[in-house]
Design a protein with these regions (language model features):
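Conserved N-terminal beta1-alpha1 strand-loop-helix module at the mouth
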Residues: 1-79, 83-91, 100-102, 159-162, ...
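N-terminal small/glycine-rich loop or linker at the start of catalytic domains
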Residues: 2-22, 111, 117-121, 132-141
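Hydrophobic faces of well-ordered beta-strands that scaffold small-molecule active sites
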Residues: 6-12, 44-46, 69-75, 105-109, ...
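Glycine-rich phosphate-binding active-site loops on the catalytic face of alpha/beta enzymes
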Residues: 47, 108-115, 167-180, 228-248
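Alpha-helix-loop-beta-strand connector modules within alpha/beta enzyme cores
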Residues: 53-78, 125-147, 188-212, 218, ...
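Catalytic cores of alpha/beta
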Residues: 80-101, 153-163, 212, 216-230
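Histidine/lysine/aspartate-rich catalytic loop segments that bind and position anionic ligands
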Residues: 114, 145, 151-202
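C-terminal helical cap(s) of enzyme catalytic domains, especially alpha/beta-barrels
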Residues: 121, 180-189, 242-261
Length: 261
């Protein structure tokens, strides 16, 4: 049975990518955020990378000013400042500096670099835990809830608890891939799903909030939403693709229905 408490946060990066492809002011990020909210989205997610190839610094400020729902800003906590070299685009101040200025409801720390097309792995806290601890503490002092992008590895999840993060966001790429092939390799799918399910159980035992995201779509979401302790899913690419076919409002409603909301 799906949980009625699983929030849907819509990632707007693909909307920004369409806008930036023509260097225009439309589609409007704030307008589309409001359309998502009016259709029932519980939150908005953005991932401003240093090169600002989709979401830009100014988008983050604009969204923070108008949103009446939670804003989740994702990014690499070690991303440094970068000049934009474009008159209409503000310089990137560094990820953590941007988050401290915006003060979103949630900040999701992700171990990607500026050359990655998309996020494709979680933190290895045996390597980065000591560096992340003071960052997490600084953000929490500002009233920002912190989530770490993680893989469904129980030992890593226990380490996440030790550095006092509020939540973890499970990287669901492997689940989505296994789901696509579940008719051909059902045993492999069940093995992968069991890893995610166990991760949800461990997170609950540790009193860690559980988020999830990456490649979730209308086909695979309902099954994933049976995982215990799932508080939020962040979905952008697939929802944007579905919006082309069904319309944005209908796409948001369809995802909420898949969550059982």
């Amino acid at each position: 049975m799906t949980s009625p408490l699983t929030a849907l946060s819509v990632n707007l990066n693909k909307i920004a990518l369409i806008r930036n492809s023509r260097d225009t002011k439309y589609p409007s990020i704030t307008k589309h955020a409001q359309m998502c909210i009016d259709a029932g989205a519980d939150g908005i997610t953005v991932h401003p990378r240093p090169d600002q190839r989709h979401i830009r610094v100014d988008d983050c400020f604009d969204l923070a000013e108008i949103l009446q729902v939670e804003l989740n800003i994702e990014g690499n906590p070690f991303a440094p400042p970068m000049k934009s070299n474009r008159k209409s685009v503000s310089d990137y101040p560094g990820f953590i500096e941007l988050v401290k200025m915006i003060k979103p409801a949630q900040c999701t720390l992700v171990p990607d670099d500026q050359h990655q097309l998309t996020s494709d792995h979680g933190f290895d806290l045996t390597q980065s835990g000591d560096k992340l601890l003071p960052i997490i503490e600084d953000l929490q002092k500002l009233g920002i809830r912190v989530s770490l992008f993680m893989e469904p590895d129980i030992d890593q999840i226990r380490l996440a608890k030790q550095i006092n993060t509020d939540r973890i966001e499970l990287y669901t790429g492997p689940y989505a891939t296994a789901y696509e092939e579940k008719e051909i390799h059902p045993e492999y799918f069940e093995k992968i799903f069991a890893q995610f399910y166990s991760s949800g159980e461990i997170a609950a035992e540790l009193n860690l909030g559980l988020n999830a995201g990456h490649d979730l779509n209308l086909s695979n979401l309902k099954k994933f939403a049976t995982i215990p302790n799932l508080l939020e899913v962040s979905i952008g690419h697939a929802l944007t693709v579905d919006a082309i076919e069904y319309g944005l409002a209908n796409a948001v409603r369809a995802y909420q229905k898949s969550l059982g909301n």
